[in-house]
């Protein structure tokens, strides 16, 4: 939700792009006229060898700021030296986003990038951003740099593809995951503004999803059919969705989300002492679980769910509980390509001693317990292969979370019944 790649990887009709590594690689799976990729630091260089043997006059090449700082500038230098016609789209999202949001290896900002590529002979250079007014008047840009709003990206690209030689677009928009983390630490501006959808007006056309490519725009089933709603807990306030031609969107400024009441509590959410005491009594009344015997063999737990919802945290809590109880444990988190929004599996193995744990991964048919935080991930091929008939017990969350397929297909239906039947 709110990822800058949602907009930055688009290309105008009649053009194509070459993929970069990391998050840029995922554009290959999307309908973004993007093909081929290279190792880190060679983004776009395939065009150097291809250009003389095709009638195609121009391509775009995607590259991230982390890759650019590491070795990507060398690829741009090679392209400029070969005098091919191409435009590098350098995404400055202010983080090494895919691997955990680390900072760059050294100091880097859009102005520095502009001066470096200009020194290599790249021109023109256009900065495209969601906040054109954020740059101080004395920003040390390379000569001739212009700044445009991201709403003009299509027009900027149409202009660039007519330019001879190597040109560059520096797309400046902070990584959505990093925005979220920094806002929690009060280290990034958090506008008092939210977009909501009036379901009575919404016709369920899905144009908001087309414009934003955002997973926070979710289906809402009503008596009048499927509508749209914005999941405010996952929204990162990108506001690309409001650019659609739709009267159902309402922008609320200055308001705050209403916090749900706690069970037995009052409007302040604090609850009364009596209610808290009652909750503690109910918790004590719960039957104690039957703990598995770890004397003979390890106990395998597989936690499945969606990245960013606490799957890894659940695995860590189980491991720490085993450690506190004096047992051995291991945890292996399989978070895939992206840390948020994708399938995540946490392999937890518990044993009487370290000598009994021969592998950190739960083997084929070796799961004694599956904690399915998301039913679709629990029914995936990888997760199913860890389950064994007569051995595995599964506890699965029935709440349905839309997938990326809904963004492309407004009539997409969640395969919940099929997933449960498979399990």
Give the residues covered by each predicted segment:
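Short acidic, glycine/serine/threonine-rich loops at helix termini
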Residues: 11-13, 21, 27-33, 71-75, ...
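Glycine/aspartate-rich loop-and-adjacent alpha/beta segment that forms the canonical ThDP
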Residues: 142-149, 155-213
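Extended, hydrophobic alpha-helical segments in both membrane/secreted and soluble proteins
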Residues: 39, 43-50, 56-82, 86-89, ...
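Iron-sulfur cluster-binding cysteine motifs and their immediate structural context
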Residues: 173-174, 179-185, 203-260
